Structure formats: structure tokens, C-alpha cells
């Protein structure tokens, strides 16, 4: 008997570089505001930016548009994602490096370190190490900009926000079963997603002196930490 081919899940589809950009818009509420807020906190001029987990270059493009004079170094562990990003003509001036962000970063100091939808996939100790290394790598006056998923303060809030998230995905064209599977996958990593209050403390412990949260919508937020 021939086995039937099982269609790829939404999460598996998001691992495919050619599908990632489209699916990101379907799964991340207010994605334009989310990434735009990251860009709003870039200083002007010839600054050096290190992007962690750059993927297909969605944020990379936003950074370049916000500050064309910036020198951007982007790290991602997926050669396929980097290959797709390199094919985007607007990212021709970006230096792409294939590496795991937990491995040593390129030498030198940076003015900005940016990471979106990356840290939630790491354990809390790994996140703490990334924050410490960021603080040590940034120049005086530098800042770390993180856009990521965060844990609400109560299960009651989590439930309400999940319902809104599901509604958004379905309205964006995601199949109901796939939306449910995406939401259920959050349970697998819930133990390593900090609340914003805990993340603030993690940043302070890592060596950052001041922290802003300029954007926060339900399960997602943008955090800016200053040296």
C-alpha cells in the first residue's frame, strides 16, 4: 500500500525560505508596526549594526531603509535563508555570515545589536548569555533592540491573547487546523519565554542601564536596552 504524502505543517512551511516572508505576515499581528518600531530606534549616520538571526532579511531590509548609511552585519545559521537574503538587491551592501548566534560573533564593537523573533527559541540561560555578550560587544552609548514573543503575567491573559492571535491568523488566510497547531506549539517553549518584567531584570543583570518598551501588543513586544 502506498502511503499518502502528508502536507507540510505551517511551522515546516516557515522553515522554507521562499515561504517565510509571506507566512510571517500571516502569523505576526501588526508586523509592520513591530518591525517599524525596531527601525525607529536606530540612530542616524554611519553606525555599525549587528543583526542576530537575520533569516530571509526582513528586518535587515527595514534597517537599511531606515538608515542607508549604516553598516549591517547579519548572522543566521541557515545557509538557505542567507542565500535568499543575498539575492535581494536592496541588501547588496549587507555582510551576511552563516553562523549560530550562540557561537562567537565577528570581532569588533557595534553601535546597535538587533534581534527579532529569535530569542524565544533559546533557553533562558542561552538568552542570558546572548544579553551579556551584547552588553560587552556594544560601544558606549550603544543599544540592543529586541522584538520577540513574551509571556503575559497570568494564564488568563495568555488565553485571551491566544484567541486574538488565532483569529488574526485565520483572517490572514491560515487554515484553522494550522492556526491551532501553531498556537499549540507555543506550549512547547512556554518555559523559556520570559515576561517583560523578567526580561527587564535579565537586561539589567547583563549590564544594561536603561530599558524601554516602545511597543507591546499582547504576546509580542519591542524592547530597547541602553548601555
Which residue stretches match the model-derived regions?
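Core SAM-dependent methyltransferase catalytic element
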Residues: 209-227
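A short glycine-rich, Lys/Arg-flanked "PGG" loop and its adjoining helix->strand segment in the class I
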Residues: 128-140
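Conserved beta-strand signature within the Rossmann-like core of class I S-adenosyl-L-methionine
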Residues: 142-149
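Class I SAM-dependent methyltransferase SAM/SAH-binding core
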Residues: 50, 56-103
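C-terminal alpha-helical "lid/dimerization" subdomain adjacent to the S-adenosyl-L-methionine
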Residues: 149-204
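Class I SAM-dependent methyltransferase Rossmann-like catalytic core
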Residues: 5-7, 14-32
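Conserved alpha-helix/loop element of class I SAM-dependent methyltransferases that forms part
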Residues: 29-45
Amino acid at each position: 500500500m502506498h502511503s499518502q504524502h502528508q502536507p507540510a505543517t505551517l511551522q515546516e512551511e516557515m522553515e522554507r525560505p521562499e515561504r517565510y516572508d509571506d507566512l510571517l505576515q500571516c502569523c505576526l499581528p501588526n508586523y509592520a508596526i513591530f518591525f517599524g518600531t525596531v527601525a525607529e530606534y536606530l540612530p542616524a549616520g554611519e553606525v555599525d549594526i549587528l543583526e542576530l538571526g537575520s533569516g530571509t532579511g526582513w528586518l535587515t531590509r527595514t534597517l537599511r531603509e531606515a538608515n542607508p548609511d549604516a553598516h549591517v552585519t547579519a548572522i543566521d545559521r541557515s545557509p538557505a535563508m542567507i542565500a535568499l537574503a543575498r539575492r535581494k538587491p536592496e541588501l547588496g551592501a549587507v555582510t551576511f555570515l552563516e553562523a549560530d548566534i550562540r557561537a562567537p560573533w565577528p570581532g569588533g564593537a557595534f553601535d546597535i545589536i538587533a534581534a527579532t523573533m529569535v530569542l524565544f527559541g533559546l533557553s533562558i540561560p542561552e538568552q542570558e548569555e546572548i544579553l551579556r555578550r551584547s552588553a560587552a560587544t556594544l560601544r558606549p552609548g550603544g543599544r540592543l533592540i529586541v522584538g520577540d514573543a513574551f509571556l503575559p503575567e497570568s494564564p488568563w491573559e495568555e488565553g485571551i491573547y491566544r484567541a486574538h492571535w488565532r483569529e488574526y491568523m485565520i483572517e490572514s488566510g491560515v487554515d484553522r487546523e494550522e492556526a491551532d497547531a501553531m498556537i499549540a506549539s507555543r506550549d512547547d517553549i512556554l518555559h523559556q519565554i520570559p515576561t517583560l518584567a523578567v526580561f527587564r531584570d535579565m537586561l539589567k543583570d547583563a549590564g544594561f542601564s536603561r530599558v524601554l518598551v516602545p511597543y507591546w501588543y499582547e504576546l509580542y513586544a519591542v524592547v530597547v536596552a541602553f548601555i
